[in-house]
A protein has these predicted regions:
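Structural signal for membrane-spanning alpha-helices in multi-pass inner-membrane proteins
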Residues: 20-24, 65, 90-97, 119
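Lipid-exposed faces of alpha-helical membrane segments in multi-pass integral membrane proteins
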Residues: 8-19, 53-63, 81-88, 110-117
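Hydrophobic alpha-helical transmembrane segments of integral membrane proteins
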Residues: 83-110
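Interfacial loop at the N-terminal end of multi-pass membrane proteins
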Residues: 2-3, 8, 14-57
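Membrane-interface extramembranous regions at the lipid-water interface
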Residues: 1-2, 6, 43, 72-75, ...
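Alpha-helical membrane-associated segments of multi-pass integral membrane proteins
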Residues: 104-128
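The feature represents the first ordered module of a protein
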Residues: 39-93
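Cytosolic juxtamembrane helix at the C-terminal end of the final transmembrane segment
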Residues: 122-140
């Protein structure tokens, strides 16, 4: 299980998704309602309920996909779903950051994009495994 490269990519996606709860994507200044007051905020995955749900879904999907190593079809489907969810995380992260008056993106803002890339590379690994199995079946 662990020797397959897509398992490592899925594990990277899981770790990156968990890290989005701990580290902020960006720090910025937000206006308080319709006043002239401003406050400093840090945006991470725990800031928005929808972002929390998407991130938890991404963690669960990548973890389940790791243990479905014997069923490549389901693993591929979970990778596609995880990829779409992680694209939603990226879009929501960008929209939350752009709502700030002034913002400074952190290095951790790359984590959602790392999740997307990890899911994509895991999908490619699963697909190459399927091709390898089909070619070996033809040799029999």
């Amino acid at each position: 299980m662990i020797q397959r490269k897509q398992t490592l990519w899925l594990l990277l996606a899981t770790v990156a998704a968990v890290l989005t709860f701990l580290y902020p994507f960006s720090t910025g200044i937000e206006k308080v309602d319709n006043t002239t007051m401003e406050r400093t905020v840090e945006i991470n995955a725990a800031e928005n309920l929808f972002l929390i749900l998407l991130t938890i879904a991404s963690v669960v999907i990548s973890t389940v996909a790791i243990f479905l190593f014997k069923n490549r079809g389901q693993q591929k489907m979970l990778c596609i779903i995880g990829l779409l969810i992680s694209l939603g995380i990226c879009a929501l992260d960008i929209s939350l950051t752009l709502k700030l008056v002034k913002y400074v993106p952190a290095l951790w803002a790359l984590l959602p994009f790392i999740i997307v890339i990890s899911y994509f590379l895991a999908y490619r690994g699963i697909r190459s495994d399927e091709k390898l199995v089909k070619s070996l079946d033809k040799l029999r």
